[in-house]
Amino acid sequence: MDNYKIIKHPLSTEKSIRLMESQNKLVFMVDIDADKKMIKKAVEEMFKVKVEDVNVYIQKGMKKAYVKFAQENPAIDIATQLGLM
């Protein structure tokens, strides 16, 4: 599956901004069929960063991925690249 089909778009909510600042995480809407390994690989290839952990949440047919980045890759820098900040 293509990286751009796996990662649909980043989420910019109050909770996602709080997670970005406190836990070095970004939240993405992802394809419902994508698993954690696929999401991790797609994010690492798209943004050239190291991902520590991926948690997923499925609700009402939509899937969110909570991606935690390594300390050397601040989530705020990635959010700035995406235009979220």
Model segments located where?
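Contiguous, often N-terminal, cationic amphipathic patches that form binding interfaces
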Residues: 1-85
